[in-house]
Amino acid sequence: MEIEFLGTGAGSPGKFRNVTSTALRLLDERNSVWLFDVGEATQHQILRTTLKPRKIDKIFITHLHGDHIFGLPGLLSSRSFQGGDAPLTIYGPKGIRNFVEVSLRVSETKLSYKIRYQELTTDGLVFEDGKFRVYAQHLDHRIECFGYRIEEKDHPGELQVEQLQAAKIPSGPVYGQLKAGKTVTLPDGRVINGADFLGPAQPGRIVAILGDTRQTPNAEKLAINADVLVHESTFAKGESKLARSYYHSTNIQAAELAKRMHVKQLLLNHISARYTGKMAAELQHQAREVFKQTRVVKDFDEIEVPFEKLTKEGTPS
């Protein structure tokens, strides 16, 4: 699981930062990529990465401001031109379907795949499969806006081979059955429950990706105990009143949220073009005074979301 930032700027494209788009690479977990927001020129940014549009099977839109959606029609079109034929699902506020369908109809664009739409009206679970759950919560922005919480389901515990050997259970295909937690009958008649030979379940990872927002209790629900929190930082320390008036957040507010909600790593994006070079470094320095594990990300930064294994005693290894 990796996060790749395709655009980390705010408002409009700049020399050093494109507008917002974030890729969650789940190639090992489900051989797919999920995008969060698709600002203008996102497909150009993708050309500078190893991402393949046909691998994108879900797009989560936080809100309908142009710097978060203007790249969507072009990306959908290019995915089709490049041979993508698998269905794609778009999640987002009411209106996202109309935006996409009108854009494609007016430009007479025909896609080689089906788009499914899930327009969000309430908070809660929006997707679940055998490996992941995704939750959405309303945020506090000038227009309807959502944040997303991606929860990986727990992994089965590791097979305790030493215990199996001590119990004189011979190795072979039976180990695979026991690893799956199945109950098996051995040739000598013994009935073995696989669950008795598994270590503690390994907790899945949690990533929270927020859209534009002022401080709100719903952000806490999304962020709590996250391995990684992606949070906007449109304004700097000392600009909280300005941030509130524009329905945005400061770097300090994001850091305070991360600290309060026991987040492991905070990644700040949606950086205004006002902050370049030393000023961007100062944004990071200010936030780290509150929450040390903070990073101001740049376009094309890749962040691995580590998988923390538990020992037999249930403590981090």
UniProtKB/Swiss-Prot annotation:
GO MF annotations in UniProt: 3'-tRNA processing endoribonuclease activity; zinc ion binding
Residues where Zn(2+) 2 binds: D67, H68, D212, H270
Active site: D67
Cofactor(s) essential for the protein: Zn(2+)
Alphabetized UniProt keyword annotations: Endonuclease, Hydrolase, Metal-binding, Nuclease, tRNA processing, Zinc
Comment on bound cofactor: Binds 2 Zn(2+) ions.
Catalyzed reaction equations: Endonucleolytic cleavage of RNA, removing extra 3' nucleotides from tRNA precursor, generating 3' termini of tRNAs. A 3'-hydroxy group is left at the tRNA terminus and a 5'-phosphoryl group is left at the trailer molecule
SUPFAM superfamilies: Metallo-hydrolase/oxidoreductase
CDD domains attached to this UniProt entry: RNaseZ_ZiPD-like_MBL-fold
Subunit and partners: Homodimer.
Role played: Zinc phosphodiesterase, which displays some tRNA 3'-processing endonuclease activity. Probably involved in tRNA maturation, by removing a 3'-trailer from precursor tRNA.
Alphabetical list of PANTHER family matching this protein: ZINC PHOSPHODIESTERASE ELAC PROTEIN 1
Protein name: Ribonuclease Z
